[in-house]
Amino acid sequence: MSTPIDSSRAASIVASILPYSRYLKRTLASEPGLQQELLDQLPNPFLWEEMLDFLQHPAISLEDEADLHRLLRQLRKRVILRLAARDLAGLADLNEVMTTMTALADTTIRFALEFLHTAMTHPGHFGKPTGEKTGTEQQLLIVAMGKLGGGELNVSSDVDLIFIYPEDGETDGRKSITNHEFFVRLGRKLIASLSDYTVDGYVFRVDMRLRPHGENSPLAISLPMLEDYFITQGREWERHAWIKSRVITGSSVAEATLMELIVRPFVFRKYLDFEAYEAMRSLHAQLRKEVDRRELHDNIKLGPGGIREIEFITQVFQLIRGGRDADLCIRPTLGVLRRLRQKQPLPGQTIEELTEAYCFLRKLEHRLQYLDDQQTQNLPQHPDEQTLIARSMGFTGYGDFLDHLDLHRQNVTRHFEQIFAARRKSPRHDTFARIRPEQSGDHETVEAFSKQLQTLGYLDPGKITARVRQFYDSTFFRQLTHSSQERIFELMPTLMEVIARFPPVDITLERILRLLEKIGQYPAYLALLQEHPQTLPRVAKLASVSQWASDYLGRHPILLDELLTSSGLHILPDWPALKTELTHQLHHVNIPKVQMVEWQMDVLRHFQHAQVFRLLVTDLEGDLLLEKLSDHLTELADLILDNVLQLAWQGLKKKHRELPAFAIIGYGKLGGKELGYASDLDIVFLYRDDHPDAASIYTKLAQNINLWLTSHTSAGILYETDLRLRPNGTSGLLVNSIEAFTQYQYEQAWVWEHQALTRARFVVGDREAGEMFEQMRKNMLCQPRDLVKLKREILMMRSKMLEAHPNPTPLFDIKHDRGGIIDVEFIVQYLVLGYAHRYPQLTGNIGNIALLKLAGELGLTSAGKATAALTAYRELRRTQHQLRLSGTPEPAGTALSRDVSQKFARVANNHLSDARQAVFQLWEDIFGT
């Protein structure tokens, strides 16, 4: 809001700031009439609406381009006068300065383009440019680059522009020309209207060198030409340049096509692009050479610790993460710094110092340019000018000012060098390099390599050497690009040093090499390991204790990003906060509608994989009980299902109500809250809706839900699903009404289906439908049953399951064999079905362990045997879980067989004998067999 300033105070303010701007002094002296206008308007920012009002004033008549040039320059003069006065007087902050200058550029470019386009498209002249494919009138897309694109333009800046037209064709006027020629001519006229220096000055210098092929290319290019250029010739520095690109003229459809379908995929990779570090280092090295050549060390933009280095820091994180995190796909540098503060890839102190330095340097840049309205970022050399600059920045002397400036530049340089520090080679690099395939034939090379391994503590260096040589000689390695091979060569010395710290080293090495085979085809992830060597010990530690964890990383290498810092890995999930975060990622993004579903599918997958991985790391540290782990994995599945249901419903074209009267019911491990890392989801779909189209609509919804869960995208899948527990199994309807489901349970369901119902629960969806299911479930489980018949049915089902899962090995199958997990589950299911009519508390969804304890307390079986069995159940599940994670035997001294199978979790027959005996005893107590 403007602060009132009387005329005498305004005059005093203007007089006090005139020494800091020779341009203001000259302009006011040459055009005295502008002074009163400045004094009257000094309290008010110069908004774009006022700029447009000036250009469109009824008293103004534009007859030709000379009139246009004059009007634009008169506007610019007024804007600069007021803006400089407000800034130097402390009435305008940095944001106002940048916003006002950006508005001036946008407004003058659009106004000039409209005038020139109208003149050129007169029927008696060239006529309207028409697309040869669409037949529609074509408009010039002007892309603002650099600071104009970012909405942070300088007061005496040039403007970086690129001219693009949607499609080729011809104009329809008397002097017909090609669209290309039309837009080139239009572009030249526009440039002249902005940059030609007349008696009234200029508006903006125009720089067109950022267009494809630079100065040697046509002034205007078509959209297809730009797309082809990005695909075939686009360079890394151009990705950096196009981050700030912004379309300021043209049709909204063409703008969306350009920015979202052509520019965005070029700038922001779908994966985490850690190769951007090396590209930015190269770009910075070129900048350094130019600074040295031109002696620009006192240039606050290009010199050490200058504005450009801050921009490089923000942009490298945008290039690395923007394809995954749409929050970072923004233009203003300060805006990116704010987002980085929220996302914390850098310490808060670093962000604060970079922000303060950027604001100080930009404020200084403007004061350097106010002196003579020159595009300069060089510190003054003359003592008088040094004094003026120091005082305009609020310092009494140039020395104090320089001390403050140097502090900011030193901070920027320090942070820049920390982020872009050159990779250090291991002291063993040269020796390890000689083991390369083309150099590893001689005995001396192998011996030198083995000796290095021996010094690292490897007990069998010959075996390890042979395995590394085999890896280098593999088809996989030979098919890698040269750059990927070089990355692995560079990584190997450090990897071998790290692996030596995590025995058993032969197993750890094997798993690491398998991981490299998985991620080697993604250079960005090899770059991650190079740029962040602190991740290597974390990867090796995981690999040393868990085959499953190592394989999971290989399937989802993007999870390496989770290992960049140890903070957050061992913190248990805050589900309300994670729910909010997921909602933001899914819905609060600027993604084209045609790409939204793919984006949301990948967001869900990345989110689910990240949460699983964080739980996995905490689990492997021994900080998580198995029951708590299952609770968290179930909470995660519930959250994913809730979001998938909403997204699938939104995606339906035919809907008859705002919210679906639809429920997802969880069975098995999902229903019993005993999910493991690789569990599939047993689900059933129900609805309560008497609309005539309800069945077909909800069937389509269920199909969509299953598609969202099981589709393989570039990010993998969410969950495998099992839909066979619905009425009549695979031959039954995919969705059922609550009434039909209830009737089936009472009239047609088999005993095994009622067994399954003991572990079922409402997961997500319509709450009323969920309550109806839960009431039906309780009523069904509380039906009195003939215990003799029930035992017979359950024993028959147990025999069928044993036949369906034969164990041809001498090992004990923890899940399927007698005395294993399924025996405990069948015992619990019998107790619920047999006695819930007397003890309704048995219908609670409290898990097998709690139900066993409750059965003992109720006297349904021996309390001692129930306690022993629930303890055994815990041990069986823990061992099964450990085996599936480790993929190897437990340490020496345990009875686990080396033939153990991850898939079936089998152990030596004499292992877990106490647990099995406890299960046998309870089984005999219940079933008498």
Swiss-Prot record:
A molecular function (GO) term: [glutamate-ammonia-ligase] adenylyltransferase activity
One biological process term in Gene Ontology: regulation of glutamine family amino acid metabolic process
Domain of life: Bacteria
Coiled-coil residues: none
Keywords: ATP-binding, Magnesium, Multifunctional enzyme, Nucleotide-binding, Nucleotidyltransferase, Transferase
GO cellular component term of the entry, any: cytosol
Cofactor: Mg(2+)
Ranges where the record places region Adenylyl transferase: 433-929
Record function comment: Involved in the regulation of glutamine synthetase GlnA, a key enzyme in the process to assimilate ammonia. When cellular nitrogen levels are high, the C-terminal adenylyl transferase (AT) inactivates GlnA by covalent transfer of an adenylyl group from ATP to specific tyrosine residue of GlnA, thus reducing its activity. Conversely, when nitrogen levels are low, the N-terminal adenylyl removase (AR) activates GlnA by removing the adenylyl group by phosphorolysis, increasing its activity.
Family: Belongs to the GlnE family.
Protein name: Bifunctional glutamine synthetase adenylyltransferase/adenylyl-removing enzyme
Organism: Nitrosomonas europaea (strain ATCC 19718 / CIP 103999 / KCTC 2705 / NBRC 14298)
